C-alpha cells in the first residue's frame, strides 16, 4: 500500500526553493514519485491518500549533536549527580519525542549517561514509543583534566558521570570493547582539555598520537 501525499509546497533539498502543487508517493521506504501533482500516478484502491495541500512539506531534519540524558542542566554536577539514571532515561525519552515533533527524524547522541540513549533507541526501534532514528555512543572516554574530569581529585569521575576515565590506551581499549558489547553505534573519545574546567588546558591533548591510534584502531 502506497501513500500519496499532496503538498501545498514541497521542499526536497535538491534545489534552492520550495515548489507548489507537488505530490509525493511513498511505497514503504521507497519514494515512487515526487513532482507536480498533475503528473502523479493515480492511487490504487488500497492506497492511502493524505491531503497536505495547505501545508509545507519537507524531508526530516538531522541533528548530529544531541544529548538526550542531560535535561535542562545548569552545571556539570546537574548532568552527573542530581537525578537518578532511571529518571534521566524517562526524561530522555520525552526529549526524543519533542525532537521528533520539531521535525528531526534522525539524531546522533555523542555521550550519554550509562545506557540511557541506547535504551531509548532500542525502545523506539521496537515500536514501543514514537521517536527519531537514534545513533548513539556510550559514555565518552576521557583522561585527566578532560571532558567529564571536572571534579576535584578526591572525588574522581563518578559512575553516574557521562564520562569514563581512561588513563592510557589499554584502559581506553577495554572501555571500547565494553561499549561495543553493549551495542553502541560509535565511540566518543574526548582528546583535549575542557574550557569549563579551570585547571584544564584546552591546548593540551589528553592522549598522545600512539594512544589515539591504538584506540581508533580498536574502535
For each of these PLM feature ranges, what is it?
Residues 1-43, 55-57:
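N-terminal metal-binding scaffold of metallo-dependent hydrolase/deaminase domains
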Residues 8, 24, 29, 54, ...:
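Divalent metal-coordination and catalytic microenvironments
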Residues 42, 124-132:
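Short helix-capping segments at alpha-helix termini
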Residues 55-126, 144-145, 210, 214:
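Metal-associated gating/positioning segment near the N- to mid-region
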Residues 67, 112-113, 137-141, 192-194:
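Active-site beta-loop-alpha junctions enriched in small/polar residues
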Residues 77-90, 151-174:
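Active-site mouth loops of central-metabolism enzymes
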Residues 119, 171-219:
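Histidine/acidic residue-rich metal-binding segments in metalloenzymes
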Residues 140-149:
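Short alpha-helix plus adjacent loop in nuclease-associated cores
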